[in-house]
Amino acid sequence: MSNLKEVQDNITTHEQQLVAARQKLKDAERTVGVDPDDVNKSTLQNRRAAVSALEAKIGELKRQLADLVAAQKLATKSVDPTGIEPDDHLKEKSSLRYGNVLDVNSIDLEEPSGQTADWKAIGTYILSFVLPIVLKALYMLSTRGRQTVKENKGTRIRFKDDSSYEDVNGIRKPKHLYVSLPTAQSTMKADEITPGRFRTIVCGLFPAQIKARNIISPVMGVIGFSFFVKDWVDKIEDFLRAECPFLPKPRAQAESFLSTNGAYFMNRQTQVEESKVQDILDLIDTAESGGATLFDNIASPQSAWIFACAPDRCPPTALYVAGVPELGAFFSILQDMRNTIMASKSVGTAEEKLKKKSAFYQSYLRRTQSMGIQLDQKIIILYMINWGKEAVNHFHLGDDMDPELRQLAQALVDTKVKEISNQEPLKI
C-alpha cells in the first residue's frame, strides 16, 4: 500500500475488527467455563487464533505506516547546499569529505591500557604450562611471528601441544595456551596476553632455555644478535673492568676499581633498589618458585638472551638488574640504526625513505618506563661507545654479494639483455 491514508484507514478497520474479536473471545471463555464440551473448546481456540491474526496484521500495518512516514520526511528534507551534515559544528564545509562512523560503544575506559599489564597474573598463567608448549608458542610468535599475526589478526588463538594437558575426571584433556592478536582498535584486559606481552614475559622467565634452543627473532637476527652474544661473558666482563668516563679518576692505584663501569653499575644498582614495585617483586618470587631461570647480575651468561625474541620492553623479571633495561634500549637503537641505513640506501623520494625509518627506541623507552623505572641514559652511551661500531659492522643489510662478483654478474646481464632486446637492463 503506497498511500499513507489507505494504510491509516486499514489500521482503523482492523482495530475495530479486533475489538469485536476480543469481545467474542471473552464470551467464548465464559461459555467454556460453564460448559467445557469439545464444541465450545474448539470455538475458543478459533476465537484466540482470530485475535492473534488481527494483532499481527495491525502490527505489520503500523510498521508500514512508520516506514511511509520516515520516507516522506526524507523526501521533504531540505538538502543543505553547503554539503555540511546537520550536526557538524563547522560554519563552512571542510576540505575533507565525510568518512566512516566509528562506533566506540565497545570501548571501556575503565579497562587498563597495554602499558599497565598485570604482569603477576600473566607470569603465573605462563608458569602453569609445561615448558615445551611455551617455547613452541614463543617460536611461532617470534621467529614466525609476522606470518602468525597476519593469518590470525583480530582473533584469540589457542596453542595446542601433546605435552600440555590436564586430567578431568580421569580423562586427559588438552590444556590450550591462549594469546590475543588485537587490531589497532582493540582494547586489551590487564591480564590478557598479546604477542608483545607474551614475548616479554617468556623471555624474562626462561632466558637460559631460549639460549639453549637458539630462538632468535628476525628483527634481532638482522642486527647481528647471534654474533653479539657469541662471547657475551667475556664481552661484559671486559666492559665492567673498563674505565668509566662518567666517574672521577682515582688518586691511588689501589682504588682503580672505583672508576670502572663495574663501580658505576654498583651505584646504579643502589638507585634501582629504591624504584621497586611490589607487584613485580611478587612476580619474581613466584617465578623463582616456579622453575624460571632468573638472574641478578648483568654478567650472567643468559642475561643478554632475554632480548633474543625482541620483547617490546624490558621483561619485568630483569627490570631491577642494573644495566639490563638499558641493554634492551641499546638493542632497540641498533634496530632503528639499521632501518635508517636501509632507508638511506633505498630508491625513492625523501618522504618514502622517511616512512621506512622506525621508532623502536622511543617505543621501548616509553613502555619500560611505564613499568616504574627510569632508564639511565649514561649506561646506554657506555654501551654505544664500547659496542656500537662492532654491532653496526655486523648488521645484515641484504647486500652480502662481493662487489667484484656483482660487477661481473651485472656485465653478463647487460650483454645478454642487449642481445635479445633494446630495453635498458635492470641492476642486480
Swiss-Prot record:
Location of the region described as Chaperone activity in the Swiss-Prot/TrEMBL record: 1-100
Annotated stretches, region: Interaction with glycoprotein N: 80-248
Tagged with keyword Ribosomal protein: no
Superkingdom as given in the UniProt entry: Viruses
Any matching Pfam family: Hanta_nucleocap
A Gene Ontology molecular function term of the record: RNA binding
The entry's keywords: Chaperone, Coiled coil, Endonuclease, Host cytoplasm, Host Golgi apparatus, Hydrolase, Nuclease, Ribonucleoprotein, RNA-binding, Viral nucleoprotein, Virion
Region (RdRP binding): 1-50
Name of the top EC class for this enzyme: hydrolase
InterPro entries recorded: Hanta_nucleocap
Residue numbers spanned by region Viral panhandle binding: 1-175
Subcellular location: Virion; Host cytoplasm, Host perinuclear region; Host Golgi apparatus, Host cis-Golgi network
Positions of the UniProt region annotated as Interaction with host RPS19: 150-175
Coiled coil: 4-71
Site (Important for the endonuclease activity): 88, 103
Interaction with host UBE2I/UBC9, as annotated region: 188-191
This protein's GO CC annotations: host cell Golgi apparatus; host cell perinuclear region of cytoplasm; ribonucleoprotein complex; viral nucleocapsid
Residue numbers covered by motif YxxL: 178-181
Physiological role: Encapsidates the genome protecting it from nucleases. The encapsidated genomic RNA is termed the nucleocapsid (NC) and serves as template for transcription and replication. The nucleocapsid has a left-handed helical structure. As a trimer, specifically binds and acts as a chaperone to unwind the panhandle structure formed by the viral RNA (vRNA) termini. Involved in the transcription and replication initiation of vRNA by mediating primer annealing. Plays a role in cap snatching by sequestering capped RNAs in P bodies for use by the viral RdRp during transcription initiation.
Family: Belongs to the hantavirus nucleocapsid protein family.
Comment block on domains: The N-terminus is required for chaperone activity and, in trimeric form, this region likely serves in high affinity vRNA panhandle recognition. The N-terminus also contains a coiled coil region, which probably participates in but is insufficient to initiate N trimerization. The YxxL motif is indispensable for the interaction with host MAP1LC3B. The central region is involved in specific RNA-binding. Has distinct cap- and RNA-binding sites so it can bind simultaneously both the vRNA and mRNA cap.
Protein name as it appears in the record: Nucleoprotein
